């Protein structure tokens, strides 16, 4: 009995194993059959699509063939129509030429008479217009003479105004103000017009312009003018006396001392003063030198420099350069301070980035350890289960989890030779 039971058990196990093998093979054959059926169905569908495309292309070929035949017929018909129309147009032009020749001969005869009549009328009309324009020109010339007389009076009035001391002074001040405005200097910051001050002797002074230069320097401009500078007549003696008087009054005013005293009271420290005597035109400077060749030397000896518009523009250009350079130096200090703040901010950001780098390194290290443990302990069991015939369905299970490592490297700092770079 025990031997029979063992034999029966063995037979059942063998039978069960055969059934499992048969089941697995049947399952495999079914899957292969299903796969082949799907491929066969896909091939049939592709064949149907290809047949449909073939039919479509054949239809298009037939349509294109019909269109080509139709176009060939149209070309032949158009050539026939063009030949017929050319022949008919040629005949029509021939007939039209005959008619036009006859009409032109008749029109030429009529035009001869009409032209003669029109010429007579045009000559009469032109004569009337000429007489009318001549009368109008005579009237305009009379009115122009009146305007010239009025303009002459206005010019004389302007000349008299300029020849007066007040008019000449205003002209010089206006010229000075226009030059200062066009020089690029900033009003009320780089220069002040008509600066009024009172001396210790209660004497009021008003230089026409004061320009603030860097390093405690001032440029004082006082415009001087005379009617003899504008007058076209030769008045060298009077001009010399007038300009010497202007120089004397300008020296007696002692702008340098009084302006320094006045401005230093306003918590502004100025050390040096340059005084300019401004003349309204370069011709005025030449007249002064011609009237008194020693005038410039005398003025320079008093630390006063006579200049015209060109000389003033040169000095203002130099002054603008100094002011701009000083402003750039002041801004340079501000830039240095801002760069210092920027470097401090960069240091703070570097500390934070260093901490972030450490955190990233720890995260990647921990992930790598997790992936190694997962691949070793979990994925090996998953593979064993899949070998037993249990699939994951539509989900694809990766063979292993990818592992990552962070490589720490120090960046090389490129040092730049500042001196060679500036060279």
Swiss-Prot record:
Keywords noted in UniProt: Coiled coil, DNA recombination
Biological processes, Gene Ontology terms: DNA recombination
Coiled-coil region list: 30-81
InterPro entries noted in UniProt: DNA_recombination_RmuC
Keyword Transmembrane helix among record annotations: no
Protein family per UniProt: Belongs to the RmuC family.
Protein name from the UniProt record: DNA recombination protein RmuC homolog
A Pfam family annotated for this UniProt entry: RmuC
Functional description taken from the UniProt entry: Involved in DNA recombination.
Organism: Rickettsia typhi (strain ATCC VR-144 / Wilmington)
Protein origin, superkingdom: Bacteria
